[in-house]
UniProtKB/Swiss-Prot annotation:
GO molecular function: asparaginyl-tRNA synthase (glutamine-hydrolyzing) activity; ATP binding; glutaminyl-tRNA synthase (glutamine-hydrolyzing) activity
Entry's Gene Ontology BP terms: glutaminyl-tRNAGln biosynthesis via transamidation; regulation of translational fidelity; translation
InterPro entries the record matches: Asp/Glu-ADT_sf_sub_c, GatC
Membrane spanning stretches: none
Keyword ATP-binding (UniProt): yes
Keyword Disulfide bond annotated: no
Species per Swiss-Prot/TrEMBL record: Staphylococcus haemolyticus (strain JCSC1435)
Name listed for the protein in its UniProt record: Aspartyl/glutamyl-tRNA(Asn/Gln) amidotransferase subunit C
EC number: 6.3.5.-
HAMAP family recorded: GatC
Length: 100
C-alpha cells in the first residue's frame, strides 16, 4: 500500500490554494492512497508485443495557420473591468513575494 503523509496532503492543498480541516486532510490522504494503489495495477499489466504510444488515437494537426488580426480596442476590453491600473486589468494577488 502506498502511504501518503499528511505533509504531502497539506502541500498539495497549499499548491491548490485550498484550506482543508484536519479531518479532510486525513480523508484526502486515504483517498489518494486508494487512487495510487489502483494506478499501481498498471505495473503488472502484460504489455508484451504492444507498441508504445503517446496517445491512443492517431492525431493530426487540424489547426489553421496563425494570422495576425486586429484585436479589440483597449478601452473596450477594459470597459467592464472591476479595477484597472496602467491600462491593464488589476486582480487580487495570488502569490506572495516568497513564491514569485
Amino acid at each position: 500500500m502506498t502511504k501518503v503523509t499528511r505533509e504531502e496532503v497539506e502541500h498539495i492543498a497549499h499548491l491548490a490554494r485550498l484550506q482543508i480541516s484536519e479531518e479532510e486532510t486525513e480523508e484526502m490522504a486515504n483517498t489518494l492512497e486508494s487512487i495510487l494503489d489502483f494506478a499501481k495495477q498498471n505495473d503488472t499489466a502484460d504489455t508484451e508485443g504492444i507498441e508504445p504510444t503517446y496517445h491512443v488515437l492517431d492525431l493530426q494537426n487540424v489547426l489553421r495557420d496563425d494570422e495576425a488580426i486586429e484585436g479589440i480596442p483597449q478601452e473596450l476590453a477594459l470597459k467592464n473591468a472591476k479595477e484597472t491600473e496602467n491600462g491593464q486589468f488589476k486582480v487580487p494577488a495570488i502569490m506572495n513575494e516568497e513564491e514569485a
